[in-house]
Amino acid sequence: MPRFIEGKLDATGLRFGIIVSRFNSFIGERLLEGALDALVRHGGDDGDIDVVRVPGAFEIPLTAQKLVQKGNYDAVICLGAVIRGSTPHFDYVAAEVSKGIAHVSLATGVPVVFGVLTTDTIEQAIERAGTKAGNKGFDAAVTAIETARLYRELR
């Protein structure tokens, strides 16, 4: 009979770093509210959560690396919104942010969760920041909790 290993959705005693981009802050702040709600709702303590604000999404990966190096975080949650405009800038930023976040997680073994919206329109971003499509900040925090617990089980 196989043994199944999975993380529990319990943030009690876990420490989290949250990085949120100030660019498109009206979206980022809704994502942050969702993430904080999820962490506290699942047993997290406000005193175990550090929120770091960065200018834009491009600064998120290096900041995540700095947080992980600082230590004592069970997971880092990355939040922001990159919205397509009329130039290729979106493609460069979205690609590098997603690659950078994945790299930090793989290089450090600490869950660094991608909660950065990459949308074609502002309407799509609004839908994913607490309206029709739920709150992706909440979802990212749930992923962080479960993954942090899973990694503790795998030690």
From Swiss-Prot:
Residues of the active site are H89
Q: Does the keyword Transferase apply?
A: yes
Statement: the UniProt record of this protein carries the keyword Zinc-finger? no
Where along the chain is 5-amino-6-(D-ribitylamino)uracil bound? F23, A57, F58, E59, A81, V82, I83, F114
Organism's domain of life? Bacteria
Annotated pathway: Cofactor biosynthesis; riboflavin biosynthesis; riboflavin from 2-hydroxy-3-oxobutyl phosphate and 5-amino-6-(D-ribitylamino)uracil: step 1/2
Can you quote a single GO CC term? cytoplasm
Write out the coiled-coil annotation as residue ranges.
none
Q: Where are the transmembrane segments?
A: none
Listed GO MF terms: 6,7-dimethyl-8-ribityllumazine synthase activity
Q: Which reaction does it catalyse?
A: (2S)-2-hydroxy-3-oxobutyl phosphate + 5-amino-6-(D-ribitylamino)uracil = 6,7-dimethyl-8-(1-D-ribityl)lumazine + phosphate + 2 H2O + H(+)
Alphabetical keyword list:
Riboflavin biosynthesis, Transferase
GO BP terms: riboflavin biosynthetic process
Q: Which InterPro entries does the record associate with it?
A: LS (IPR034964), LS/RS (IPR002180), LS/RS_sf (IPR036467)
- Give residues annotated as binding (2S)-2-hydroxy-3-oxobutyl phosphate: S86, T87, R128
This entry's Enzyme Commission designation comes to 2.5.1.78
A family per Pfam: DMRL_synthase
Family membership noted in the UniProt record: Belongs to the DMRL synthase family.
Purpose of the protein: Catalyzes the formation of 6,7-dimethyl-8-ribityllumazine by condensation of 5-amino-6-(D-ribitylamino)uracil with 3,4-dihydroxy-2-butanone 4-phosphate. This is the penultimate step in the biosynthesis of riboflavin.
Q: Mind telling me what this protein is named? A: 6,7-dimethyl-8-ribityllumazine synthase
From what organism does this protein derive?
Geobacter sulfurreducens (strain ATCC 51573 / DSM 12127 / PCA)
- Tell me the organism's taxonomic lineage: Bacteria, Pseudomonadati, Thermodesulfobacteriota, Desulfuromonadia, Geobacterales
